[in-house]
Every structure is written in C-alpha cells, then in structure tokens.
C-alpha cells in the first residue's frame, strides 16, 4: 500500500531540489543566496536525486534551517514593514514563504518538535510562532536571499550519505550534539510547565 510522504519530507525535497537548481544554474549566485562556500555549492550542484531522496526519507529533521534567530528576526521584520509591492511574487519569495509557513506551523503545533526539527532555540521558536501571515509575506517580499540555509555543508552531508541506508539518522544526530542539548532543554521546559 502506498503511504503519502510527510509534510517535512515534501518540504525537504522541494527545498533541496530548489537549492540544487540554483547551484546548477549559477553557482556564484547560489553561494550568495544560501551563504555557501564553493565546496558546498559544488556538492549541492552535483547531488543526485537518489542522495536527495535518501536524506529526505531517512532524516527526521529539516534539511534547511532558518537564517534568522530570535535576535535577528525582529530587525528583519522591522525592515520589511510598511513596504508595499504590487507585483507578481518571484520564485525566491514563494520559496521563502513556503518554508517560513512550514516553520511557523511547526512552532504552533509544538515548540519542542520545532526546536529539534529546525535546530533553533526555544526563543526562536516562540518568535516564529508569533509571526503572523502579513509580516511573513512582507518579509518574503523584501529579502534578496533565502530565508533558509542548508543544514549540512559538503563534508557533513557526504559523511551522512556514506553511511549505510537505515543508519543515516543516527549518524546525523551524532554530528549535532547542540541540537540534542537544545531539544532536551525544550522538552524539560515543556514538561515542567504543563
């Protein structure tokens, strides 16, 4: 029987395919859009469909993480407020909107899950949960870069993909001890307040 992929799987898949498209079309522009070094841009330019699918299906976390945290998000939103733009949205704006909406939805469902999935602090999860649709759209219309960056550079992604199928999530988690600490702190705060 066919099972539909999770929303996270679809978000990861579309995000990585979009990243690869930009790395193939114009590597120098992709390095600016996603804050990539040349080696990582080359990796994502050459990454295969099978490798993208392996990362998306085996890892239970977002493969693109937010550019802004709880300290930088308010300034980015303040810079976007009051600007009016009556034109068709660009590919970049739609990409940013799709990923910001997915993050906002995750934060509204469960801050603890959002902290783990997106590698963010509890304060950052709170900031994105409070973000309304109008401010999200305004932010997307003013950004000239991706609001989300690849979670892994070329070295980390290659190490994960070199692991046997079925064990990649374990190795990915082992590389990210800071995520585990943030997730445990979020879990404890949720447990203690409810």
Q: What is each residue range found by the language model?
A:
Residues 2-53, 57-67, 169, 175-194:
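N-terminal domain-start signal
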Residues 11-13, 24, 95-97, 108, ...:
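A short, structure-level motif marking secondary-structure boundaries and short turns
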Residues 6-10, 91, 120:
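Structural motif
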Residues 19-55, 102-140, 144:
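Amphipathic alpha-helical packing elements
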Residues 57-89, 142-179:
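Long, compositionally biased
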Residues 82-109, 113-116:
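Short, solvent-exposed interaction modules
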């Amino acid at each position: 029987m066919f099972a539909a992929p999770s929303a996270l799987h679809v978000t990861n898949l579309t995000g990585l395919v979009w990243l690869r498209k930009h790395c193939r079309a114009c590597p120098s522009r992709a390095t600016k859009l996603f804050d990539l070094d040349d080696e990582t841009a080359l990796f994502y330019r050459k990454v295969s469909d099978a490798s993208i699918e392996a990362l998306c299906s085996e890892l239970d976390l977002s493969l693109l993480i937010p550019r802004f945290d709880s300290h930088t998000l308010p300034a980015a939103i303040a810079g976007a407020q009051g600007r009016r733009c009556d034109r068709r949205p660009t590919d970049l704006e739609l990409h940013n909107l799709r990923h910001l909406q997915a993050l906002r939805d995750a934060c509204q469902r469960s801050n603890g899950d959002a902290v783990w999935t997106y590698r963010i602090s509890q304060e950052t999860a709170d900031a994105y949960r409070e973000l309304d649709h109008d401010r999200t759209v305004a932010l997307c219309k003013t950004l000239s870069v991706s609001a989300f960056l690849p979670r892994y550079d070329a070295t980390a992604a290659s190490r994960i993909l070199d692991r046997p199928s079925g064990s990649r999530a374990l190795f990915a988690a082992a590389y990210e001890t800071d995520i585990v600490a943030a997730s445990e702190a979020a879990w404890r705060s949720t447990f203690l307040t409810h």
